[in-house]
Amino acid sequence: MAKQSMIQRELKRERLISKYSAKRQLLKEELKTVSSYNDKLAIYKKLEKLPRNSSPNRHRNRCWATGRSRAYYRDFGLSRHVLREMAHEGLIPGLTKSSW
């Protein structure tokens, strides 16, 4: 199980991403339309002033059951350990363990 502080940090990042996404998108669109170098620098400065954790690149997917960040399966929102256990128990609809 991941530390609670790490899980809370990721939740904080998700909140910041959703809060600043419109502003960040607007600045990036403006950056594409502007042609002068000085204007681009000014827009980059505005982007840099946004909180660092509001960037979607800093978000890390985590398993909703354990908080584990590695070996994460997007389709299920689970890490490989939990996915395997739940598949064995038949808790994931439509998923069966193969055997031959």
Swiss-Prot record:
It is found in: Plastid, Chloroplast. Gene3D superfamilies: 1.10.287.1480. Keywords: Chloroplast, Plastid, Ribonucleoprotein, Ribosomal protein, RNA-binding, rRNA-binding. InterPro entries: Ribosomal_uS14, Ribosomal_uS14_bac/plastid, Ribosomal_uS14_CS. Its main location: plastid. It comes from the Eukaryota. Part of the 30S ribosomal subunit. It holds the Pfam family Ribosomal_S14. HAMAP family: Ribosomal_uS14_1. It comes from Emiliania huxleyi (Coccolithophore). The keyword Cell division does not apply. GO terms for cellular component: chloroplast; small ribosomal subunit. This is Small ribosomal subunit protein uS14c. The keyword DNA damage does not apply. Binds 16S rRNA, required for the assembly of 30S particles. The gene is rps14. GO terms for molecular function: rRNA binding; structural constituent of ribosome. Disulfide bonds: none annotated.
